[in-house]
């Protein structure tokens, strides 16, 4: 029999939770070769998912970080019991293809968002397209975000982007501190879209392209699309699902 896999961050809180689980699994083991328990914060979960992007396993996150939006709350009394009752959701990442000023092409996936950020004191000068359709001919700003529904309550929300429900089949494009045009609020588009972002002045106004926390500098042309060939199966406690967390954030946004 193959027992579940436990992956934890290296901080004291994570290791303490891991030790607790191992001790209790010896008393009452869960024989499930498809279950991966991830102990840490959101950043650690994103890192773990990317390392296992070709896996068909189910990931149950336990928060030992700060906010832990993608994680479940740890409870000595209830966590062990919650594994068998957890609800699954499936999310698809973004795929980012970056061509830099030297013509080199790099690729990465992003679970939360792709961030296009100015790389110097100069604001970024960008054009944004959805396929062949121009969304905005010239955006002068600190950058722009392309966010998934799962990531719409993270960095995207901080730049006043819209919160997307998990079943919306949408992506959000949100400007960061737009200077021209000042009133452009971004756009919600289909998750089938192919987004093309071009640096209009790469020599004077360099930009970085960041997939979650992986940065590629001196980007010139960026293509962003949903990768339906990669999927992540996440498990959540039935009383605190990811859908419910997103709904709570929507209500908070509407009432503030």
Describe each PLM feature range:
Residues 28-31, 88, 108, 118-121, ...:
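Solvent-exposed alpha-helices and their adjacent loops that cap or buttress functional pockets
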Residues 1-35, 39, 44-55, 74-90, ...:
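ATP/NTP phosphate-donor binding region
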Residues 36, 114, 144-148:
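Short hydrophobic core segments
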């Amino acid at each position: 029999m193959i027992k579940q896999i436990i992956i934890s961050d290296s901080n004291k809180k994570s290791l303490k939770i891991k030790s607790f689980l191992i001790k209790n699994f010896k008393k009452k083991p869960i024989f499930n070769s498809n279950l991966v328990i991830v102990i840490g914060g959101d950043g650690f979960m994103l890192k773990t998912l990317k390392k296992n992007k070709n896996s068909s396993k189910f990931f149950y996150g336990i928060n030992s970080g700060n906010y832990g939006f993608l994680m479940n709350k740890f409870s000595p009394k209830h966590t062990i019991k919650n594994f068998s009752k957890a609800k699954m959701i499936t999310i698809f990442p973004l795929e980012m293809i970056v061509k830099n000023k030297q013509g080199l092409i790099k690729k990465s996936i992003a679970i939360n968002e792709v961030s296009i950020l100015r790389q110097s004191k100069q604001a970024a000068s960008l054009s944004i397209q959805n396929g062949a359709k121009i969304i905005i001919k010239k955006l002068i700003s600190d950058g722009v975000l392309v966010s998934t529904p799962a990531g719409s309550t993270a960095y995207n929300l901080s730049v006043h982007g819209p919160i997307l429900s998990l079943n919306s089949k949408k992506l959000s494009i949100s400007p960061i501190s737009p200077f021209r045009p000042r009133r452009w609020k971004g756009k919600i588009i289909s998750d089938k879209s192919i987004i093309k972002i071009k640096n209009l002045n790469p020599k004077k106004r360099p930009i970085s392209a960041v997939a979650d926390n992986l940065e590629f500098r001196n980007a010139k042309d960026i293509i962003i699309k949903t990768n339906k060939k990669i999927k992540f199966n996440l498990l959540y406690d039935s009383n605190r699902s990811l859908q419910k967390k997103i709904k709570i954030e929507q209500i908070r946004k509407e009432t503030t």
